[in-house]
Design a protein with these regions (language model features):
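PLP-dependent enzyme catalytic core of the Aspartate aminotransferase-like
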Residues: 163, 307-311, 316, 320-351
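Active-site pre-lysine segment of PLP-dependent enzymes
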Residues: 114, 131-142, 155-176, 180-213
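Phosphate-binding glycine-rich loop
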Residues: 56-98, 116
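Conserved PLP-binding catalytic core of the aspartate aminotransferase-like
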Residues: 265-266, 278-311, 327
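Conserved PLP-anchoring active-site segment centered on the Schiff-base-forming lysine
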Residues: 90-112, 124-126
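N-terminal "arm"/small-domain region of PLP-dependent enzymes with the aminotransferase-like
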Residues: 1-58, 62-65
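PLP-dependent aminotransferase class I/II
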Residues: 200-278, 284-285
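Short beta->alpha connector loops at strand-helix junctions that form conserved
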Residues: 103, 119-127, 205, 318-319
Length: 351
């Protein structure tokens, strides 16, 4: 049975969230002399002399309305990497506890475990990059504090089967974190819609992919108010900058632009997949619910990778054993996709 309070590290249970004098003031202050800021303004071109809202209230309100949740169910972070690290720190005691990962998958779960001196238990995905019945049973039986499930998965691109995730949610005693960094490209409802059913569910999303805002570093976590309240206890006071909050609000006010880009990338994925399928050096293109295509090349993916680099085309070469012989190809703008395909055809001719 899931019991959040018993999972939280004892030292965190007694912590209180950061509070400033401005939290005690209601309304709009006429004179602010509490935080030792520079009241004369900024040395740069814009007015950033005041600290940002540490609670990111305006952004959370806009996101809550967009996602259909309460603002108290939203946590914002300096990229998803920060909230992954915070979740590990929230529950797992250094040198004592463990977390779960399902490779091949996003590498930051392993990094967060190592940084926090927490053991990493790995339950490998099956050959089709799905959770097997045996894998699900191992996850449920584990005494780990957290299981991270990346869906759509990076670097494989596929959604994990919803029934498998639901089994883990119903059986695992710790937090189940579903990382939906690429969820906007998938034809499936977000797990945010299931938060009311599962108090042990945390859903991660990001502004870095479909929103096209990787440079502002803004991640999102959606969970029960209780989980979010604990995260607020341990985050740094001003973890999301004023500039990031302004840019996020501007993006959230123009969801039409977001949807247009999303549709263009989905069409680009389809077009790129069709072009790759015609190339003899392409052995297999794995099904993708993301903005990239994991592609197996023959006879030598490494040679293809080096050929592309020599022509100024940078793709990702997965390092995990289950992805041997593959390259991860991001769906770019049409001109970038065309350049990629042309370079691959050139490799065939040269070979």
């Amino acid at each position: 049975m899931f019991d959040l309070d018993s999972l939280i590290r004892p030292n965190v249970r007694v912590m209180k969230p950061y509070s400033s004098a401005r939290d005690e003031f209601q309304g709009e202050a006429r004179v602010m002399l509490d935080a030792n800021e520079n009241s004369l303004g900024s040395a740069g071109p814009a007015e950033f002399n005041r600290y940002p809202d540490p609670h990111q209230r305006a952004v959370k309100q806009a996101l809550a309305q967009l996602k259909g949740v309460a603002p108290e169910q939203v946590f914002l972070s300096n990229g998803s990497d920060e909230v992954i690290d915070l979740l590990v720190r929230l529950l797992a005691r250094p040198g004592q506890d463990s977390i779960l990962s399902t490779p091949p998958t996003f590498g930051m779960y392993e990094v967060a475990a190592a940084l926090n001196d927490v053991a990493l238990e790995c339950v490998e995905l099956a050959a089709d990059y799905q959770l097997s019945d045996e894998g699900i049973a191992r996850l449920i039986a584990s005494k780990a504090k957290i299981v991270f499930l990346c869906s759509p998965n990076n670097p494989t691109g596929n959604l994990l089967r919803p029934a498998a995730i639901e089994q883990v949610l119903r059986g695992f005693a710790g937090l189940v974190v579903v990382d939906e960094a690429y969820g906007d490209f998938a034809d499936q409802p977000s797990w945010i819609t299931r938060l009311a059913e599962f108090e042990n569910l945390v859903v991660l999303q990001t502004f870095s992919k479909a929103w096209g805002l990787a440079g502002i570093r803004l991640g999102m976590a959606f969970a029960s108010p209780a989980v979010i309240a604990y995260l607020n206890r341990i985050k740094m006071p001003y973890n999301v900058s004023e500039n990031t909050q302004r840019l996020a609000l501007a993006a959230l006010a123009d969801t039409g632009r977001f949807e247009a880009m999303r549709q263009e990338l989905l069409q680009g994925r389809e077009t790129l997949q069709a072009a790759l399928a015609e190339l003899p050096i392409v052995d297999h293109i794995f099904p993708s619910d993301a903005n990239f295509l994991l592609t197996r090349f023959v006879p030598d993916a490494g040679a293809v990778y080096r050929h592309l680099l020599e022509r100024g085309i940078v793709v990702r070469r997965p390092s995990q054993a289950a992805c041997a012989g593959t390259l991860r190809l991001t769906v770019g703008a049409a001109v970038e996709n065309d350049a990629l395909v042309a370079a691959l055809r050139e490799f065939e001719v040269a070979g």
